[in-house]
UniProtKB/Swiss-Prot annotation:
Protein name, UniProt field: Phylloseptin-J7
Modification Leucine amide, positions: L19
Record keyword Signal present: no
The protein's role, per its UniProt record: Has antimicrobial activity.
Keyword Oxidoreductase: no
Domain of life: Eukaryota
Entry's localization field: Secreted
Amino acid sequence: FLSLIPHAISAISAIADHL
């Protein structure tokens, strides 16, 4: 589960960059 956290953060950062 902990390995998913950095992936989720990078995904959120990518989405926020489009906003």
